[in-house]
């Protein structure tokens, strides 16, 4: 096929591929919104923060979300187009994810994939991999971060062949904007001098200079991460953080140490017992590693990861040695940041390794090109053929799964819309689900949204929320015991039960 030649792709060919990639992104976003039209929990927080921003309530904004830039964009976009904050967030996310797909192709080309075949392979990855599609129906800031992270990597790669100042400035600006979406962007911004040193020839740079940059970047990143850890609870301003950086890092280290010590104590008491208490640190370290591995493979998916490992095992690399060093450095930095998150929180949300996965995927077009060139189907043994077909079908299935996230929360939306006609005053609804409160128009009543059902029942028994006229509880479909417990605790049956074929159910109670 002419599309899959080794000839360099001209401007018209590249423009055609990028246009098809963008069109596919728009259609994919429309499809994902069609099959999942229920807002996500984070989306409620962003909308709540945007509403506080619109009223000039910065304290309420930061109470809703400590990283309000995306909410500010939703506010501006909504005002500009005259649409709701919900649709402003959805349109922004659709644009960001589509731009990420296009930028991914450009980054692969900047890393040496300039042929027609590699350009097509890059577009194929950007169109079908779940990392680009799985969260299109969500209102999240990660998509904005991913766009500007990829833009920074594009400028870094272009600095290799043309060390122009405009590319260096582009790296700084892109990382700075990425930092407005997620803390990782700020860490990469402070590490920019180190990353720029990686793309310089080792013959013109002293090892001690690179070591000095590493120490400085690590120190600045430690200050930023310490502020990120302490700011939500202590209300520390960024300027104040850098005015006393050593105290900030010391306080953060003390908090991390106390948190880890508590986790170790729990492991000793609940899992190991007195005769194996000395293995608590080993179990903790193993837990952190497994959290990292599980989150990374969950986002990258096993078949795609095996393709990358196969390529690395076969010696696949980028054409320029410096780009290999840059790629490895970016992956190492992502793993270091995720390790800090895992140690502090002992969990990683599924989308946290999103940028890491996209970085790893940069090698996939080159690995795919190598594998297809090396495989001789007629020479493969039966076992190898079966394995190849199995991995291919697995990879296709993983790709389809990113486009098959049909909502399981329609009962929540139905209940919220029904309650919207019955809970018109502030404090009239108590619920354990933010999405339900959003559709009922009561998401601004933060004190009336409690995720723990037991706390709601105890609060009702103690006379909390006296103005609430309705109680709406989302219960898992499998939690029959919890449902009977709720009915027994409230002393009566619900006035309405919202249920669908799949997903959770909602029990609505009317208070006397």
Description of each model-found segment:
Residues 110-112, 152-168, 178:
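Membrane-interface transmembrane helices that cradle and orient dolichyl/undecaprenyl
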Residues 54, 108, 156, 387-438, ...:
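Membrane-embedded, lumen/periplasm-facing catalytic core of multi-pass transferases
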Residues 279-324, 334-335:
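Hydrophobic, aromatic-rich transmembrane alpha-helices
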Residues 41, 66-67, 137-144, 349:
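Short acidic/glycine- and proline-prone juxtamembrane loop motifs at membrane-interface regions
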Residues 34-48, 61-76, 83-84, 234-241, ...:
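Extracytoplasmic catalytic/substrate-binding loops of multi-pass membrane glycan-assembly enzymes
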Residues 24, 121-130, 134, 154, ...:
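Short helix- or helix-capping micro-motifs
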Residues 91-112, 151:
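Transmembrane-helix motifs of polytopic, lipid-linked glycan transferases
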Residues 117-120, 173, 194, 215-220, ...:
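Signature aromatic-anchored transmembrane alpha helix within multi-pass, membrane-resident enzymes
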């Amino acid at each position: 096929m002419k599309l899959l030649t080794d000839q360099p792709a001209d401007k018209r060919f590249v423009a055609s591929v990028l246009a098809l990639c963008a069109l596919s992104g728009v259609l994919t976003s429309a499809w994902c919104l069609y099959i999942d039209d229920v807002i996500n929990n984070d989306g409620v927080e962003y909308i709540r923060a945007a509403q506080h921003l619109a009223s000039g309530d910065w304290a309420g904004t930061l109470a809703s979300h400590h990283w309000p830039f995306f909410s500010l964009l939703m506010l501006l976009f909504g005002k500009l187009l005259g649409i709701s904050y919900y649709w402003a967030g959805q349109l922004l996310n659709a644009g960001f994810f589509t731009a990420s797909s296009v930028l991914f192709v450009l980054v692969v080309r900047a890393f040496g994939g300039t042929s027609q075949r590699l350009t097509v392979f890059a577009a194929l990855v950007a169109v079908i991999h779940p990392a680009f599609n799985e969260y299109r129906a969500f209102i999240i800031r990660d998509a904005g971060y991913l766009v500007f992270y990829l833009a920074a990597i594009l400028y870094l790669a272009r600095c290799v062949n043309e060390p122009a100042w405009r590319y260096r400035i582009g790296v700084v600006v892109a990382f700075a904007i990425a930092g407005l979406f997620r803390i990782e962007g700020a860490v990469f911004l402070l590490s920019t001098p180190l990353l720029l040193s990686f793309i310089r020839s080792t013959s013109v740079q002293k090892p001690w200079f690179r070591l000095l940059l590493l120490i400085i970047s690590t120190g600045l990143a430690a200050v930023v991460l310490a502020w990120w850890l302490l700011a939500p609870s202590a209300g520390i301003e960024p300027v104040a953080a850098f005015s006393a950086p050593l105290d900030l890092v010391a306080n953060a280290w003390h908090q991390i140490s106390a948190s880890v010590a508590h986790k170790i104590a729990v492991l000793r008491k609940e899992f190991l017992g007195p005769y194996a208490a000395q293995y608590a640190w080993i179990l903790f370290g193993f837990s952190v590693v497994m959290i990292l591995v599980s989150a990374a493979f969950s986002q990258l998916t096993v078949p795609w990861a095996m393709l990358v490992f196969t390529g690395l095992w076969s010696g696949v690399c980028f054409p320029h040695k410096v780009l290999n060093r840059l790629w490895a450095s970016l992956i190492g930095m992502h793993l270091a940041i995720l390790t800090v998150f895992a140690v502090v929180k002992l969990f990683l949300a599924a989308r946290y390794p999103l940028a890491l996965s996209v970085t790893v995927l940069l090698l996939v077009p080159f690995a795919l090109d190598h594998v297809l060139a090396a495989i001789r189907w007629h020479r493969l043994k039966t076992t190898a053929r079966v394995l190849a077909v199995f991995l291919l079908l697995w990879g296709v299935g993983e790709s389809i799964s990113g486009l098959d996230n049909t909502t399981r929360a329609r009962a929540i939306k139905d209940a919220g819309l029904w309650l919207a006609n019955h809970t018109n005053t502030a404090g009239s609804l108590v619920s354990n689900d933010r999405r339900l409160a959003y559709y009922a128009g009561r998401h601004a009543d933060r004190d009336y949204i409690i995720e723990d059902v037991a706390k709601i029942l105890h609060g009702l028994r103690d006379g909390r929320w006296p103005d609430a006229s309705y109680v709406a509880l989302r219960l898992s479909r499998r939690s029959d015991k919890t449902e009977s417990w709720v009915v027994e605790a409230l002393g009566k049956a619900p006035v309405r039960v919202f249920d669908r074929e799949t997903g959770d159910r909602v029990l609505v109670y009317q208070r006397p």
